[in-house]
Amino acid sequence: LIGDYKVGTSKQYISQIIDSNDIPNLGESMLIASPTGSGKTSAVIKMIKHTSMPVIYVTNRKMALCQFKKDDIKASKGLDVPAELLDSISLGENIIAITYQELAETTYKYKGKKHLLILDEVHCLLEDANFSVYAEKIIRYLKANRDNIARIYLTATPDAVTPVIAEIECESGQEQALFAMDWDTNVKSVFHAYASYKTRLKMVYSMESNWNYINFKLYTPDDTKELADYIKRENEQGTKSLIYVNDISKGKVLQEVLGNTQHIYSDEDKRAEIAEIAQNEKFSDRNLITTKVAENGVSLHDDELNLIVVETLDPITLKQVIGRARVNRKNPREITV
């Protein structure tokens, strides 16, 4: 049974409803499902301070990893570390921060060892399973080591992650749990779906979403000039834009039309630039064209970033990209998507 669940309002931050001492016991898990910008990382950093267990923090992108390291060092040591030094500074004796891919390659190091495992952006275990084997390796590792690991799952898109959680956490009735599971704002459907089955998920924290600050528009993907002209007009008014594309070739076409535009297509070829964006929490040009490398994890605190272009039919990707532009949850500025 799920022990309990709490739901916060769209104007609250997750740290206002979560107890930093409420850390899962070994063999148990917790789900924090709240929108981007609601303070999941800050809440987790506070929880890390309250545990004596070794901690492994895992996320799916280098950009998100830089952001976590920056936030953790600032919270624990009070330091604003230059981007180029992030990799050289230790997070602490008992804290490791790695990507899911790195964990998949090194699970043998942690087999049978007791620790707190924080799985950020955990929906990626489903999203990336179509083109990478790391997700399957990690799920196998989690199921084989449930007794010696305390688990905290973090996601802004819970509807995309419940099947993974059911597979890992349900010890009986998994097929029925997967069939019955659905997600709503109040978490009641998840609660009832698990209620008949033995599960190790003991706590769910959820936050309501607010999309009222978003002004949605549609464009024709093949008409690059029309889109570029719109972006240029917005730039002339002082607006910066984040442009998410599915393939690099489309990004290069937009680069040519928009001019010498800042772009990041891989987290390997522009590590210094990625670290700089994470450090400054904004990009330097009027426009940034990117792919999945900046889909999640990075926080852009820039009041000039008021236009987001997303080339996708996937609502999960849409939510993740919108969430890169951080707004004040109590009084958000208007953003065109």
Question: Where on the chain are the PLM-derived regions?
Answer:
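Interdomain hinge/linker at the junction between the two RecA-like core domains of SF2 helicases
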Residues: 158-230
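A short beta-strand element within the Helicase C-terminal
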Residues: 289, 298-312, 336
